[in-house]
Protein backbone atom coordinates (compact mmCIF):
# COMPACT_ATOMS: atom_id res chain seq x y z
CA UNK A 1 0.00 0.00 0.00
CA UNK A 2 1.27 3.43 -0.93
CA UNK A 3 4.10 2.02 -3.03
CA UNK A 4 4.71 2.39 -6.74
CA UNK A 5 2.39 0.42 -9.04
CA UNK A 6 5.19 -0.44 -11.49
CA UNK A 7 7.35 -1.85 -8.69
CA UNK A 8 4.54 -4.08 -7.39
CA UNK A 9 3.41 -5.19 -10.84
CA UNK A 10 6.92 -6.00 -12.08
CA UNK A 11 7.12 -9.14 -9.91
CA UNK A 12 3.95 -10.53 -11.52
CA UNK A 13 4.16 -12.27 -14.93
CA UNK A 14 1.19 -10.28 -16.28
CA UNK A 15 2.28 -6.91 -14.80
CA UNK A 16 -0.87 -6.64 -12.67
CA UNK A 17 -0.38 -6.33 -8.88
CA UNK A 18 -1.23 -9.44 -6.84
CA UNK A 19 -3.69 -7.55 -4.60
CA UNK A 20 -5.76 -6.45 -7.62
CA UNK A 21 -6.09 -10.01 -8.92
CA UNK A 22 -6.71 -11.50 -5.47
CA UNK A 23 -9.54 -9.08 -4.61
CA UNK A 24 -11.25 -9.07 -8.01
CA UNK A 25 -11.14 -12.88 -8.23
CA UNK A 26 -12.96 -13.12 -4.91
CA UNK A 27 -15.55 -10.55 -6.03
CA UNK A 28 -16.16 -12.53 -9.22
CA UNK A 29 -16.47 -15.71 -7.19
CA UNK A 30 -19.07 -14.51 -4.68
CA UNK A 31 -19.88 -10.82 -4.97
CA UNK A 32 -21.45 -10.32 -8.38
CA UNK A 33 -25.01 -10.43 -7.08
CA UNK A 34 -24.30 -8.25 -4.01
CA UNK A 35 -26.45 -5.12 -4.17
CA UNK A 36 -24.30 -1.99 -4.32
CA UNK A 37 -21.03 -3.90 -4.77
CA UNK A 38 -18.12 -1.39 -4.70
CA UNK A 39 -20.48 1.35 -3.47
CA UNK A 40 -20.94 0.05 0.08
CA UNK A 41 -18.06 0.22 2.54
CA UNK A 42 -16.61 -2.53 4.70
CA UNK A 43 -15.87 -2.44 8.43
CA UNK A 44 -12.86 -0.24 9.14
CA UNK A 45 -11.13 -2.54 11.66
CA UNK A 46 -11.20 -5.56 9.34
CA UNK A 47 -10.10 -3.38 6.42
CA UNK A 48 -7.04 -2.29 8.44
CA UNK A 49 -6.21 -5.91 9.29
CA UNK A 50 -6.50 -6.97 5.64
CA UNK A 51 -4.41 -4.00 4.45
CA UNK A 52 -1.76 -5.03 6.99
CA UNK A 53 -1.67 -8.59 5.61
CA UNK A 54 -1.31 -7.39 2.02
CA UNK A 55 1.31 -4.80 3.04
CA UNK A 56 3.49 -7.57 4.52
CA UNK A 57 3.35 -9.39 1.19
CA UNK A 58 1.25 -12.23 2.59
CA UNK A 59 -1.56 -14.08 0.80
CA UNK A 60 -4.74 -13.67 2.88
CA UNK A 61 -7.65 -16.09 3.00
CA UNK A 62 -10.50 -14.15 1.37
CA UNK A 63 -12.93 -17.06 1.28
CA UNK A 64 -16.43 -16.80 2.68
CA UNK A 65 -15.40 -19.07 5.55
CA UNK A 66 -12.48 -16.84 6.54
CA UNK A 67 -12.11 -13.70 8.65
CA UNK A 68 -12.94 -11.45 5.69
CA UNK A 69 -16.25 -13.06 4.78
CA UNK A 70 -17.95 -9.71 4.09
CA UNK A 71 -17.36 -8.89 0.44
CA UNK A 72 -17.47 -5.14 1.23
CA UNK A 73 -14.22 -5.47 3.19
CA UNK A 74 -12.49 -6.80 0.07
CA UNK A 75 -13.96 -4.19 -2.28
CA UNK A 76 -13.14 -1.36 0.14
CA UNK A 77 -9.53 -2.52 0.48
CA UNK A 78 -9.15 -2.68 -3.30
CA UNK A 79 -10.48 0.87 -3.70
CA UNK A 80 -8.19 2.05 -0.89
CA UNK A 81 -5.23 0.40 -2.61
CA UNK A 82 -5.90 2.35 -5.81
CA UNK A 83 -6.41 5.61 -3.88
CA UNK A 84 -3.08 5.25 -2.06
CA UNK A 85 -0.94 4.70 -5.16
CA UNK A 86 1.69 7.48 -5.42
CA UNK A 87 0.93 7.67 -9.15
CA UNK A 88 -2.64 6.79 -10.10
CA UNK A 89 -3.44 4.01 -12.59
CA UNK A 90 -4.23 6.82 -15.05
CA UNK A 91 -1.37 9.29 -14.33
CA UNK A 92 -1.69 13.11 -14.53
CA UNK A 93 -0.26 13.47 -18.05
CA UNK A 94 -2.66 10.86 -19.47
CA UNK A 95 -5.51 12.40 -17.46
CA UNK A 96 -4.83 15.82 -19.03
CA UNK A 97 -4.84 14.37 -22.54
CA UNK A 98 -7.98 12.29 -21.90
CA UNK A 99 -9.72 15.36 -20.45
CA UNK A 100 -9.08 17.23 -23.71
CA UNK A 101 -10.46 14.32 -25.74
CA UNK A 102 -13.48 13.66 -23.49
CA UNK A 103 -14.60 17.28 -23.14
CA UNK A 104 -14.74 17.69 -26.90
CA UNK A 105 -18.15 17.57 -28.57
CA UNK A 106 -19.84 14.21 -27.83
CA UNK A 107 -20.41 13.40 -31.51
CA UNK A 108 -16.72 14.02 -32.19
CA UNK A 109 -15.55 11.63 -29.47
CA UNK A 110 -12.51 9.98 -31.02
CA UNK A 111 -12.18 6.54 -29.46
CA UNK A 112 -9.02 5.77 -31.45
CA UNK A 113 -7.32 8.88 -30.03
CA UNK A 114 -8.40 7.78 -26.55
CA UNK A 115 -6.98 4.33 -27.30
CA UNK A 116 -3.70 5.90 -28.46
CA UNK A 117 -3.44 7.82 -25.20
CA UNK A 118 -4.06 4.68 -23.13
CA UNK A 119 -1.64 2.68 -25.30
CA UNK A 120 1.09 5.12 -24.26
CA UNK A 121 0.74 4.20 -20.57
CA UNK A 122 3.64 2.37 -18.93
CA UNK A 123 3.04 -1.42 -19.16
CA UNK A 124 1.97 -1.98 -15.54
CA UNK A 125 -0.47 0.94 -15.67
CA UNK A 126 -1.83 -0.27 -19.03
CA UNK A 127 -2.23 -3.89 -17.91
CA UNK A 128 -3.78 -2.94 -14.57
CA UNK A 129 -6.26 -0.58 -16.26
CA UNK A 130 -7.13 -3.27 -18.80
CA UNK A 131 -7.55 -5.86 -16.02
CA UNK A 132 -9.79 -3.70 -13.82
CA UNK A 133 -11.79 -2.57 -16.88
CA UNK A 134 -12.53 -6.18 -17.84
CA UNK A 135 -13.51 -6.90 -14.23
CA UNK A 136 -15.87 -3.92 -13.96
CA UNK A 137 -17.57 -4.90 -17.22
CA UNK A 138 -18.24 -8.35 -15.72
CA UNK A 139 -19.69 -6.68 -12.61
CA UNK A 140 -21.93 -4.47 -14.78
CA UNK A 141 -23.33 -7.55 -16.52
CA UNK A 142 -25.07 -8.37 -13.21
CA UNK A 143 -26.47 -4.85 -12.80
CA UNK A 144 -30.08 -6.08 -12.77
CA UNK A 145 -29.20 -7.69 -9.41
CA UNK A 146 -26.28 -5.66 -8.02
CA UNK A 147 -27.58 -2.28 -9.32
CA UNK A 148 -24.07 -1.34 -10.47
CA UNK A 149 -24.26 -0.44 -14.14
CA UNK A 150 -21.38 1.17 -16.03
CA UNK A 151 -22.37 4.70 -14.94
CA UNK A 152 -22.54 3.72 -11.25
CA UNK A 153 -19.21 1.90 -11.42
CA UNK A 154 -17.64 4.91 -13.16
CA UNK A 155 -18.87 7.17 -10.33
CA UNK A 156 -17.01 4.94 -7.85
CA UNK A 157 -13.89 4.29 -9.92
CA UNK A 158 -13.41 7.63 -11.73
CA UNK A 159 -11.82 9.40 -8.74
CA UNK A 160 -10.20 6.11 -7.60
CA UNK A 161 -8.34 5.17 -10.78
CA UNK A 162 -7.49 8.71 -11.85
CA UNK A 163 -6.45 10.00 -8.45
CA UNK A 164 -6.50 13.49 -7.02
CA UNK A 165 -4.86 16.84 -7.56
CA UNK A 166 -3.38 17.50 -4.12
CA UNK A 167 -1.89 20.84 -5.15
CA UNK A 168 -5.29 22.28 -5.99
CA UNK A 169 -8.07 20.17 -4.39
CA UNK A 170 -10.89 22.55 -5.39
CA UNK A 171 -9.98 22.09 -9.07
CA UNK A 172 -9.87 18.34 -8.51
CA UNK A 173 -13.30 18.38 -6.86
CA UNK A 174 -14.79 20.20 -9.84
CA UNK A 175 -13.24 17.66 -12.22
CA UNK A 176 -14.89 14.60 -10.64
CA UNK A 177 -17.51 14.59 -13.40
CA UNK A 178 -14.77 14.45 -16.05
CA UNK A 179 -13.10 11.51 -14.28
CA UNK A 180 -16.43 9.67 -14.19
CA UNK A 181 -16.92 10.39 -17.91
CA UNK A 182 -13.42 9.11 -18.74
CA UNK A 183 -14.01 5.79 -16.95
CA UNK A 184 -17.50 5.50 -18.50
CA UNK A 185 -16.06 5.95 -21.99
CA UNK A 186 -13.30 3.40 -21.31
CA UNK A 187 -15.82 0.84 -20.01
CA UNK A 188 -18.25 1.42 -22.88
CA UNK A 189 -15.50 1.09 -25.52
CA UNK A 190 -13.30 -1.53 -23.87
CA UNK A 191 -13.23 -3.88 -26.86
CA UNK A 192 -11.80 -1.11 -29.06
CA UNK A 193 -9.44 0.33 -26.44
CA UNK A 194 -8.17 -3.05 -25.20
CA UNK A 195 -8.23 -5.49 -28.12
CA UNK A 196 -7.38 -9.02 -27.00
CA UNK A 197 -4.29 -9.21 -29.19
CA UNK A 198 -2.35 -6.62 -27.18
Over which residues does each language-model region extend?
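Alpha-helical catalytic/interaction cores of small GTPase-regulatory modules
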Residues: 1-198
Amino acid sequence: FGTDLSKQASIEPDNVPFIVKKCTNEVEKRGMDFEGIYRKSGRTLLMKILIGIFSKGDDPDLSEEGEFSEITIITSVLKQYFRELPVAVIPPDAYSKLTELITADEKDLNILEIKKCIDSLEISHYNTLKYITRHLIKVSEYSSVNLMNIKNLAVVFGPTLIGSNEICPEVDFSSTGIKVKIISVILENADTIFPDDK
